[in-house]
UniProtKB/Swiss-Prot annotation:
Family, per entry: Belongs to the terpene synthase family.
Record protein name field: Eudesmanediol synthase
Binding site for substrate: 310, 314, 450, 453
Chain sites annotated for binding Mg(2+) 1: 310, 314
GO terms of molecular function: magnesium ion binding; terpene synthase activity
Site label Required for the use of hedycaryol as a transient intermediate during the reprotonation of germacrene A, positions: 303
First and last residue of the signal peptide: none
Predominant location category: cytoplasm
Cofactor binding, per record: Binds 3 Mg(2+) or Mn(2+) ions per subunit.
Length: 557
């Protein structure tokens, strides 16, 4: 089943990057270098003190034993959507145990609560059967219109819950089709009020389990006060927390913008994309919590460097130069810089020096992680070279060949390792071994990334030097039109999301931090490639979202 947000029709007038064309310059320039945050240090201190007081009050109010199960389900969901769950993980864990152990009463408070419970448990890796939806289905197997159609919130919850499907769950295929059709009808007729109308529109673009957490929090804070039974304590804490986390993000973005300006101006590769603000937006979509600051910095810096390398292989270097760049990366030694053409030497030196700085930052007991990160980066250059060879030789790979290579060139395996390098002790040596082995979950996350990217390339047009993508290889191999092949790739994309859901529930708890990075990276890609756009390459497509996330005033405190 094709995901609802994918547009598979090709554009009649595609913008083309590559060859003699250049990527558009950054839409931000040095804006975040000079931007002065409206929150003073004194104000931030006062807000932090107030937030700590409110957290204590929430802990006192969060009495899982005294709440009924339906109320507990709603409370946990509210904490998560308001972006507060990282402050109450222990309480949420205990609450989920009770939610999973206790059955809801008959009809369980309606479709909304039944579906919400299903989604929450599955998102936390707790298996729950689709049998819970039997009460809302007819004898023939379809969903009962009389029970569901007059309940927009319930339909929305069903639609979101059904996107936690694993392969082969036909009941949830039916649920998606049923709920989507009715939600579209409701929106077109204007039959639902705010804020549910906005939540439906958002989910029809990207279902909640695939939507980035930070963006959902941004939207939900504005919507929550319009809920009939909203909790003023949670709302105040959520607003404070959002502003405090944003202040940290803006400091990080300023530091990264300064770092990137120095790097980009030093290496002098004008053919490469200048996209640090977009990279950082991507980063916050993956990990926004305060405790992951170092991981964000590692991710963003590495993403920037690998983007320079990727664009060199893709749109500028000759095949001979590609071979030399790959060989230099394998040797990983500044004394080998002479094998490179002059224009690539500074890129090579700066890459190695930045990795040295990464290692210096790591605590002694975490320096073992550098071996994994270097090997991942080296492997990335090998695979970029293979793509360059295919492109130069105009080789038409089989779909299987393309899929295997693109799992690695998606960047997800390498970037997962680089992100984990900035984690605390929860990222174990076993986690690095697991990601490095490219298990099924990492493969699925990489394929989500690649298929989204390739559907975008099909719609927008490819770089002149690009090798055939997933759509083109599938089209040639199966004798299909381009749009037919794109629809098939969209269906494969949906299947890979279901594999992600399944492997998340099966994984050993010691690997959960790494698994969550993989999931979050796939989520972040959904917003970058929404409706077939490529908001990384074409940064103007992301400008409004960046403005809203980092600059728009949160509702008055």
């Amino acid at each position: 089943m094709a995901p609802s947000n994918i547009v598979v029709q090709s554009s009649s007038t595609p913008p083309v990057a590559g060859g003699d064309e250049e990527f558009a310059p950054s839409v931000w320039g040095d804006f975040f270098v000079t931007y002065a945050t409206p929150v003073s240090q004194a104000s931030e201190q006062r807000m932090s003190e107030r937030a700590e007081l409110l957290k204590a009050q929430v802990r006192q109010a969060f009495d899982a034993a005294s709440m009924d199960v339906a109320g507990l389900i709603t409370y946990v969901d509210t904490l998560e959507r308001l972006g507060l769950d990282n402050h109450f993980r222990d309480l949420i864990g205990a609450a989920l145990e009770r939610i999973g152990a206790e059955e809801l009463p008959e009809h369980g408070g309606g479709l909304h609560i039944v579906a919400l419970r299903f989604r929450l448990l599955r998102q936390h890796g707790i298996w729950v059967s689709t049998d819970v939806f039997d009460a809302f289905r007819e004898d023939a197997g379809g969903f009962c219109s009389s029970l569901c159609s007059d309940d927009p919130r319930g339909l929305l919850s069903l639609y979101n819950a059904a996107h936690m499907a694993v392969p082969g769950e036909v009941v949830l295929d039916d649920a998606i089709a049923f709920a989507r059709g009715r939600l579209l009808d409701i929106i077109s007729k204007g039959e639902v009020r705010s804020p549910v109308s906005e939540q439906i529109t958002r989910a029809l673009d990207i279902p909640l389990p695939r939507f980035t957490r930070r963006l959902e929090t941004m939207h939900y804070i504005a919507e929550y006060e319009h809920e009939e039974a909203h909790d003023g304590l949670l709302l105040e804490l959520a607003r404070l927390n959002f502003v405090l986390v944003r202040a940290l993000h803006l400091r990080e973005l300023k530091d990264l913008s300064l770092w990137w300006r120095e790097l980009y101006n030093t290496v002098k590769l004008p053919y490469a994309r200048d996209r640090m603000v977009e990279i950082y937006f991507w980063t916050c979509g993956m990990l926004h919590e305060e405790e992951y600051s170092l991981a964000r910095m590692f991710f963003a810096k590495t993403f920037g460097m690998v983007s320079l390398m990727d664009d060199t292989f893709d749109v500028h270097a000759t095949l001979d130069e590609c071979h030399k760049l790959k060989e230099a990366m394998q040797r990983w030694d500044e004394s080998e810089v002479s094998i490179l053409p002059e224009y690539l030497r500074l890129l090579y030196i700066k890459t190695l020096s930045n990795f040295k700085e990464f290692e210096e930052i790591l605590e002694p007991n975490k320096k073992y992680r550098m071996a994994y990160t270097k090997e991942a980066y080296k492997l990335c250059s090998k695979n970029y070279l293979k793509e360059a060879i295919w492109s130069n030789q105009k080789y038409q790979p089989s779909f299987k060949e393309h899929e295997e290579l693109s799992i690695m060139t998606s960047g997800l395996p390498m970037l997962t390792i680089l992100t984990l390098m900035g984690f605390g002790d929860e990222a174990t040596p076993e986690a690095f071994e697991w990601v490095s082995s490219v298990p099924e979950m990492v493969r699925a996350g990489s394929q989500v990334t690649r298929f989204l990217n390739d559907l975008s390339s099909y719609k927008l047009g490819k770089n002149k030097k690009d090798m055939p993508g997933s759509v083109e290889t599938y089209m040639v191999e199966n004798g299909l039109t381009g749009d037919e092949a794109a629809a098939a790739i969209a269906a494969l994309l949906e299947n890979r999301w279901r594999i992600l859901n399944q492997t998340r529930m099966e994984i050993d708890h010691t690997l959960l931090p790494a698994a969550q990075v993989v999931l979050n990276m796939a989520r972040a890609n959904e917003i970058i490639y929404l409706h077939g756009r490529d908001a990384y390459t074409f940064g103007a497509d992301l400008k409004d979202l960046v403005t809203t996330l980092f600059l728009k005033q949160v509702l008055p405190l």
